[in-house]
Amino acid sequence: MGLISGKVCVFIFVFALVAEFSFGNVEVNDDKHFFHKPRPFLHKPRPFLHKHGIYKKGFGKGLGGGGGLGGGGGLGGGGGLGGGGGLGGGGGLGGGGGLGGGSGLGGGGGLGGGSGLGGGGGLGGGGGGGLGGGGGLGGGAGGGYGGGAGGGLGGGGGIGGGGGFGGGGGGGFGGGAGGGFGKGIGGGGGLGGGYVGGGHH
């Protein structure tokens, strides 16, 4: 009986020892394999999310310019309050100018001129217009309140209007024929004005 008990104890000891070295190592390896494995698919860089073209570049740049308050510019220009300019000019309140000019309240000018309230002409004329509008180099029609045909170099209009270099019909509130350098009918306009004597021939 004691011999059988001793053999059983030895068998249990050997079995436990073998199980420790075999199944114990498998459990450790499985633990490392399944639970401590690095996850490269979770830590990959995402080039489609971090492209410079998406996050680093703005959307309001380039050809055609911006806008907003005091805004943009560029080719074709912006607008807004006090806005743009550039080639083709802007507009808005007090707005742009540039090549081809703009308009607006107190607006543009530039090459090709503009209009608006108090607006001007520019090089090569364009319609004056608005309240006290004007001509520019090469003239253009004055207009607005008290206007009249602008004309010539620095032509005019406005209340009581006038001519300019190269003359043109004055105008204005009660005004007469405007004069200027090289015109026959001299004189100015003004409030209650009239025809005044000849100018330089």
Swiss-Prot record:
Q: Where are the sequence repeats?
A: 62-67, 68-73, 74-79, 80-85, 86-91, 92-97, 98-103, 104-109, 110-115, 116-121, 122-129, 130-135, 136-143, 144-151, 152-157, 158-163, 164-169, 170-175, 176-182, 184-189, 190-194
**Protein name, as recorded:** Glycine-rich protein 23
Is Heme a UniProt keyword of this protein? no
Q: What keywords were assigned to this record?
A: Repeat, Signal
What is its induction behaviour? Slightly induced by 16-hydroxypalmitic acid (HPA), a major component of cutin that triggers H(2)O(2) production. Accumulates in response to abscisic acid (ABA) and salicylic acid (SA) treatments.
Ranges for the region named 21 X 6 AA approximate tandem repeats of G-L-G-G-G-G, Gly-rich are 62-194
Q: Which GO terms describe its biological process?
A: response to abscisic acid; response to salicylic acid
Q: Which residues form a coiled coil?
A: none
Q: Origin organism of this chain?
A: Arabidopsis thaliana (Mouse-ear cress)
Signal sequence span is 1-24
